[in-house]
């Protein structure tokens, strides 16, 4: 007679089934149980502000996937950072926002041992950034540029009757002048921290004035031109200029250069120009930083370090038409961009540019209230 089989207890039977299943998995894919967890970096950057190739190449080189979201306002970014648990590992604040965000404790110090490509940074730009981030402890410059006037060259000539194009803030802030552009479309950045200081500067006042009377004067000036502004938006003007939908925009230098490139690529006959007004304009710096509550800190450092490779920084500048803070990249940047004084200003032009300081909360609230009233026409 055959010996009867031993009946296993249920717990031991379950364990045997698990081991059998595990063995089957290992036969099909021996590495499966030991596969490394997926590496991810969550990035929050300005819209239209990176060459797509860079994200693809970074993942290919490092194995780190990039989840990439965009914003078009420092206020949007700041609201997420101050609320906490933003979900992002790398963010890109502008200098004067960076300064107060550092004071608010929303960033962690960079581990410079993980950023060997900082050897490529431009000391001049790093020194300017130190105004907002003493010691450059929390941020690395990503791009920098100016806030000026973009225009449709043909329609600007028709509106002004001048062959030389636009060279003054008077085109924007003189109501009689701006009215001439109303029929072909005017857009303006939706950014109190860009437009109010520009109006102050045009009035001969300190663009960093914290005087309430000065700020009211700048708001009153903008209210006087409000009827001629079709829209306040901080990114839509790029395509609108490129397609000829509008003829004038107050915007960021590289954005307007992108509009210029898109029009050329489309062969639509639209010639887009960019002017840094003769009175002067704002010089700003956008910077890479890691939120205090970032969950993928090593991956964040890897991403920042990758962006500071000279060839990568140059690829980015060639695509977005902004200057960067990487000195070693300049030998790889297209000559037309490097020699364009509206992108890389010379010393004479730099002397006419101003930078914005971080405002205290009281003044910031006042500026926001004035801006809302301007936009709503109240």
Language-model-detected regions and their locations in the chain:
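Mature extracytoplasmic/periplasmic domains
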Residues: 286, 291-352
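Hinge/lid segment of periplasmic solute-binding proteins
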Residues: 99-144, 170-173
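Ligand-binding "clamshell"
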Residues: 102-110, 127-129, 134-136, 228, ...
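Early extracytoplasmic/lumenal segment of secretory-pathway proteins
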Residues: 34-101
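Conserved C-terminal helix/tail region of periplasmic/extracytoplasmic solute-binding proteins
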Residues: 239, 347-378
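Short beta-strand->loop
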Residues: 108-119, 170, 266-282, 291-294
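Ligand-binding pocket segment of bilobal, Venus flytrap-like solute-binding proteins
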Residues: 187-199, 203-273
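Twin-arginine (Tat) signal peptide motif
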Residues: 5, 9-19
